[in-house]
Amino acid sequence: MTKEKFDAIVVGAGMSGNAAAYAMASRGLKVLQLERGEYPGSKNVQGAIMYANMLEAIIPDFRNDAPLERHLVEQRFWIMDDTSHTGMHYRSDDFNEVTPNRYTIIRAQFDKWLSRKVCEAGGTVLCETTATGLEWDSAGKAIGVRTDRAGDVVLADVVVLAEGVNGLLGTRAGLREMPKSKNVALAVKELHFLPEEVIAERFGLTGDEGCVIEAGGTISRGMAGLGFLYTNKESISLGIGCLISNFAETMERPYALLDAFKRHPSIQPLIAGSEVKEYAAHLIPEGGFNAIPRLCGNGWVVVGDAAQLNNAVHREGSNLAMASGRMAGEAISIIKSRGGVMDKASLSLYKTMLDKSFVVEDLSKQKDMPSLLHTNSPNFFTTYPQLISHAAQNFVRVDGTPKIEREIATTAAFLRARSRWGLVSDAVRLASAWR
């Protein structure tokens, strides 16, 4: 391990860590990035959605060589019960633009590519190295990290914590609390391989067009959670995630949940004949605005999942991670160019930039939504999906029963399940949390 001092140390080589490291290295800072995995992305085998405008702000010409799977032209939203789904979808040829807005990616490939860009920009990336603790000076300022390499210490003016939602470095140092189980989801995912032409036929795609399905309902067995399906070039990323607190309360097994989701009559035909080659579990921050910890201090900043920056309502995580990492890197670069000290007062520039961005604005707008869905999960994820399915079937079934009788039966079913006050109360709380 080198003994030289760096301008910045970035702990973690995921979306936020790579964005921060690149932002600083490309501006001439001496950057060391530590990754505990064998290579960046080795612990992220799952698929994901990448939002182009966030990456364009970091690497404008990323489309030239980034490992992109498909650009998304169709979004489907499903409300599922045990045997059916009621859905809506949006598809537009406008998304077949010269510079598409969203892509599916395989994190293992993408993270490795982005880390390579960090190296090309002048950063140093050291893999299979775990940061075990922060190093402090006598004034209480972080001045580096200790590693598992024979207890070695690496010094820097500032440390960027991009260690993920369950990172121990920040919690051990007392910079943040261990996230509460109600604010973290466990997602289990599989990668199903199919020929490219089969995927195109099943989803009505041409070229490198892609489709995303996001689903909620009885598939989560009364827990707050969602299922998802992403189309890649020659594979399908399939998974489901629920709050850890719900798993603890119900004793449901995550993989059993995924297995049932795969066998659902709306999903099974889409993955029939596929070969499963990869399985992964991943923790996702779900607490939203109210769960955001301290973002900066004397000699340190927190970015990405470690800062609970994930928009669960709009299913946005990677773009918030890249945006926060970029802003942290830019703020540190500005402070460095001014000859400033990396103390809490100076590093608050990062928080100011974040507060003025869409990241915090969007999260604060719907700060009450995570709590509402968590405390009312049986209604929103079981009762209403079943009622909606029943209403939809009543609407389309024709068997000689007068329409007025079907309408009365549908209304009665809703009132039996929730009552007038319950329906109005749920609607008001949902609207209030959404605005």
UniProtKB/Swiss-Prot annotation:
Gene Ontology molecular function terms on file: oxidoreductase activity
Keywords: FAD, Flavoprotein, Nitrogen fixation, Oxidoreductase, Plasmid
Coiled-coil regions listed in the entry: none
Gene Ontology BP, a term: nitrogen fixation
Keyword Repeat annotated: no
InterPro entries with a match to the protein in the record: FAD/NAD-bd_sf (IPR036188), FixC-like (IPR039651)
SUPFAM superfamilies for the chain: FAD-linked reductases, C-terminal domain, FAD/NAD(P)-binding domain
Needed cofactors: FAD
Biological role stated in the UniProt entry: Could be required for the formation of a functional nitrogenase Fe protein. Probably accepts electrons from FixA/FixB and reduces a quinone.
Family per record: Belongs to the ETF-QO/FixC family.
Name under which the protein is recorded: Protein FixC
Taxonomy of the source species: Bacteria, Pseudomonadati, Pseudomonadota, Alphaproteobacteria, Hyphomicrobiales
Gene behind the chain: fixC
